[in-house]
Amino acid sequence: MIILYLFRLSLLCAVALLSVTVRAGSSPVLILEHAADRLELASWLDILPATTPPESSEQLLAQPDTLPWRALDQSVLAQGYRSEGLWLRPKIQNFGLVQRRILELNRSNLGHIEVITRRSNGSWQTRTAGTAELSPQGDINGLGYSFEVVIPEGMSTIYFQLKSSYPLTTPIHLSTENALLRASQNSAAVYGVGIGLLGGI
């Protein structure tokens, strides 16, 4: 009787420890508020280990929650050389009405970007960009890339994959249109100052 009781107690403790471990393994859910016009997403990003990447986006979307996602645990995405591709996701909770936001990926050294978001009809939309893409979406001015995303009411998830031929240190923001415009103007101003200093030298 005592052995059975101890067995049940140890089993209960193991289940509790496992649940704590699972919760600790993922990043917290981003609570989207209208007042937050520009958010650095790194603190809310989950990442797939390089040892278990899905073979395609179709495989990812088939069973997304069964994959071994873990918290990024970085203040900004800094992953070094990642030519094989890196899958990331933020989980977002929107308690208000539908919001339109801009997903910003800074830096010009992103060879391939794939952004996957859910449409209002339940299907998935996939968009690509990057310097390696045969399209006019290459980062001409070095200011990065931006994708409009619709954040529905309730819980939602954005998936994206990044590939880079250089060390991957890429700020990722979720912004309003006005915040994106201000950030672009600031970046362009800094770029212009750099060119001016170079010309003066």
Question: What kind of region is each of these model predictions?
Answer:
Residues 1-10:
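Bacterial N-terminal signal peptides that target proteins for export
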Residues 11-12, 16:
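Hydrophobic helical h-region of N-terminal Sec-dependent signal peptides
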Residues 19-21:
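N-terminal signal peptide c-region/cleavage motif recognized by signal peptidases
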Residues 25-187:
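Soluble non-transmembrane domains of integral membrane proteins
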Residues 183-201:
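Core alpha-helical transmembrane segments of integral membrane proteins
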